């Protein structure tokens, strides 16, 4: 029993280990593609964000360069186009011959970091009032013209292209038979026809007149002909008369033994036996199957 319990315990442990291994392998097979897809999605999103940041920085840097290139002296006054305009004058600078003149411009410095985007500007002023329309809003309908008289017909135009072919018309009624023509020339003789069927048997001929038969003279002896083919085998001959009996043959081998005969009648009953000895009861039984008796014997 203890050995069987150990086998069951080891079997349970082995099955559990195999089951956990299969579950772990399936989990890895399912998790790895999901992690790969997530990492690929994050990488693609980061690349899009970096490209967007680069484009924004490039746009900001372009606007900064445009602001630097604007001339500060040419400033347009505000409220231009209203009641009063303010003309901005350029700053007057006095000349000085004895002053030190600035040197040549140095090399361009490294571009600075892009600044933060500015705050949205204040809303603009209302626009100027629009001009009145040059044309009326409702279209003016001119009076209808009087109908002119019909002019003379023009010259005929060139013939048009030929139309498509029409469908087949209905079949006409059969015409009258023509007059028979003149007989034609004799044609060449045709090929020989197939042989005709055999004719009916003719009438039997008349019997020849009876005349005495006169034998003719014998002709010369001819050369001997070739040997003819062998003839058909002849009919088998009749059976002959039976012969005289032959001498006595040797003795044959002994035959197989015959089958057993029928069982005999039962014999008479024997004399009754004597009285048997007294039985001996076993004293105890051993574990290995032996039996011990009171007289010390073992069976």
From Swiss-Prot:
Pfam family, one: Col_cuticle_N
InterPro entries, alphabetized: Col_cuticle_N (IPR002486), Collagen (IPR008160)
Chain intervals with Gly residues compositional bias: 163-172
Region (Triple-helical region): 103-132, 151-177, 181-202, 216-278
Biased composition range(s): Low complexity: 173-197, 250-268
Residues annotated as signal peptide: 1-27
Biased composition (Pro residues): 129-161, 215-233
Stated family: Belongs to the cuticular collagen family.
UniProt name for this protein: Putative cuticle collagen 155
Gene that encodes the chain: col-155
